[in-house]
């Protein structure tokens, strides 16, 4: 990493002004419907990368291209892109009718008022088992939208419920990339981090579920939704959900869904053999923008890191926060800032690990608590950025199924990260220091 240089963070500011600033201006000041869609996120990132390339003229353009390429050479980035594409193929194969059958079947078994609460709980379990919030959101978004259409609940509320549940599970799962990154970086056992994490995350999940139930009971929905459904078309989603709960690798789960979905759609005559591959292709194509965002973010962050932008951020946080509680809050803001900058909580944790470990040693904070705080605050940050992988994959899946939903609509219905922030702040400032080193 080069000498600390706060100016290197300018591309992030440029992106935020273009995407968030103009989006808010168009939608809420100029009252343009779906104003955020007038700001293509890829163009905003391209402008930000252009600004990054114009900085630091002591580095040649060819060298900058090499740096951006090195930023893409990361397992997490490749895994994320492949999940996007394979998940898109799954959505393309099973189509909207299969998701609707799942939703109608669920709503036939439970009162319509509890539909959103059930979505949240299911997402919690699936994400904990699968270890990926992105995979969980991809699998459950079509179901959430079908539940919305069948029950009358707003689509952003249903998507917000599954996103919150997915973040809860990803935050706790033993096989989550964020858990692995945090525990390896801080040198603690996963079971110890889980126990520390669970007592913070559980109250937030309970509060989220309670709020969803309150909103549900305030609605005028009564009884059950009685719509026809095809049990055979439910099979791909059942297999995928069972695979997720069993903790099977997300790629294996999605491939099972694609194979079973293809067979069922062909056998029932829902899809012609000549259309099957085309449907897969259109489904994956619906994820192209999401995959491109992941690529552009990785490239931009590689330049910022080389210029010393992240080093300056780390140094500033380390210098400002003093004392044990201040150290814990500083760790949280550190990884939160990294997450906002990179839009990838695993990358943010990896980047924050070295300075967080140093702060933990200085302030007497145990490795398990440090790992837990890094994972929790990165989760909170993912809930407040409209360009995170979780949000993008939800929007892409919704768009693929014909729904026009803005990130801000979902963010106002994404309750879990807010409750998690309150829970962790209470834990930091009101919990007495009793742990042993």
Residue map of PLM features:
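Core transmembrane alpha-helical segments of multi-pass membrane transporters/permeases
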Residues: 38-46, 50-55, 64-98, 113, ...
């Amino acid at each position: 990493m080069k000498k600390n240089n706060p100016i290197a963070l300018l591309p992030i500011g440029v992106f935020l002004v273009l995407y968030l600033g103009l989006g808010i201006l168009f939608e809420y000041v100029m009252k343009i419907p779906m104003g955020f869609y007038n700001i293509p996120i890829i163009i905003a990132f391209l402008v930000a990368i252009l600004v990054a390339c114009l900085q630091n003229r002591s580095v040649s353009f060819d060298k900058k291209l090499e740096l951006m390429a090195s930023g893409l050479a990361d397992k997490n980035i490749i895994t994320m892109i492949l999940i996007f594409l394979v998940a898109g193929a799954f959505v393309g194969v099973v189509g909207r009718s299969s998701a609707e059958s799942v939703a109608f079947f669920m709503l036939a078994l439970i009162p319509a008022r509890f539909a959103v609460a059930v979505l949240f709980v299911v997402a919690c379990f699936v994400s904990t088992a699968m270890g990926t919030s992105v995979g969980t959101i991809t699998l459950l978004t079509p179901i959430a939208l079908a539940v919305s259409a069948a029950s009358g609940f707003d689509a952003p509320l249903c998507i917000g419920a599954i996103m919150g549940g997915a973040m809860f599970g990803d935050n706790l799962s033993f096989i989550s990339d964020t858990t692995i990154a945090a525990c390896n970086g801080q040198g603690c056992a996963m079971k110890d981090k889980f126990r520390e994490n669970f007592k913070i995350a559980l109250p937030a999940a309970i509060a989220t579920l309670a709020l969803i139930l309150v909103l549900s009971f305030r609605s005028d929905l009564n009884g059950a939704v009685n719509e026809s459904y095809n049990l055979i078309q439910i099979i791909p989603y059942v297999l995928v959900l069972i695979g997720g709960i069993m903790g099977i690798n997300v790629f294996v789960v999605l491939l099972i869904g694609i194979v079973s979905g293809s067979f069922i759609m062909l056998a029932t005559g829902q899809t012609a053999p000549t259309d099957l591959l085309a449907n897969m292709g259109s489904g994956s194509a619906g994820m192209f923008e999401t995959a491109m965002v992941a690529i552009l973010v990785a490239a931009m962050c590689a330049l910022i890191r080389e210029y010393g932008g992240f080093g300056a951020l780390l140094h500033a946080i380390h210098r400002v926060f003093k004392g044990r509680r201040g150290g814990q809050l500083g760790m949280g803001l550190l990884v939160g800032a990294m997450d906002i900058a990179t839009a990838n909580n695993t990358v943010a944790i990896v980047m924050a690990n070295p300075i967080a470990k140093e702060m933990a040693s200085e302030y007497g904070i145990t490795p398990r608590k440090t790992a837990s705080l890094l994972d929790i605050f990165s989760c909170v940050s993912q809930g407040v950025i409209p360009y995170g992988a979780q949000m993008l994959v939800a929007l892409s899946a919704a768009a693929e199924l014909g729904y026009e939903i803005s990130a801000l609509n979902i963010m106002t219905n994404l309750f879990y990260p807010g409750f998690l922030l309150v829970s962790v702040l209470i834990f930091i400032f009101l919990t007495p220091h009793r742990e042993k080193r």
